[in-house]
Amino acid sequence: MGFVKGACKKDDLKKGLFDDGEGNMVAIPDTGTCALLQPYHVSRGKLFIHERFDNFSFVDSELVSSCIERTRFPVSGWKEYEDTKGLPGLARVADLIGQLGDSEYLHKISALFYKFEELGINEGINCKSPGELRRGYAHFFWGVVHKYVENGVNLLQVTQEGKEWISRLHSHVFECEHFILDSETQTNLWFWIRKVFDLSSIIGDSWSLPIKNLILLILLDAI
């Protein structure tokens, strides 16, 4: 909810002023998307819960708020944020795997890149294209995310749906680890692939498919 303009009571859509969840108001231009609320979305989400549910006894708004807080990223250095087994820690697992294990995640890399561009993040991480962002996926997972989701992954093994999420997550990691080619290699590979398909049109379709497959396997093995 922290990304939604108008979610917090003090948000003023007409003036383009939005509560940052910490008692301050931030201005977002008409041309700015909800992505500009990224730095504040966790605090805004907590504020939303307190504003809407503090008066309802059946909702433990403090617990919900602590779960939202644990999804803050980068992760705070405070010791309590190291816990990965409690409910807030598992909420972080759900948040991370829900994003990185999304079946369409790798197709959304371009949108994520332009979100980062709007926020000025790309310059800070020296990322110049969606391809470079995709290239860093596996490193980001193993170097940053894995230690926070390991316990949650074990729990997901209990159900079939959970196993499917794990499978998609590992599939994304594997794809980014093993199918990354530099631009020169990509150019050379596609040059020879075009040659293979041009050759098949000359040879004929009756026996060209096995030949194409064999040549493509040789090309990929040579990379």
Task: Identify what each model region corresponds to.
Residues F3-K14, E51-F58, E69-I223:
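Divalent metal-dependent phosphate-bond-processing catalytic cores, especially two-metal-ion Mg2+/Mn2+ enzymes
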Residues G45, S61-I68:
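A cyclin-like helical interaction fold
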Residues G21-P29, R44, F73, P88:
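Alpha-helical context
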Residues A35-L36, V59-E62:
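A generic short-segment signal for beta-strand/edge and adjacent turn/coil regions
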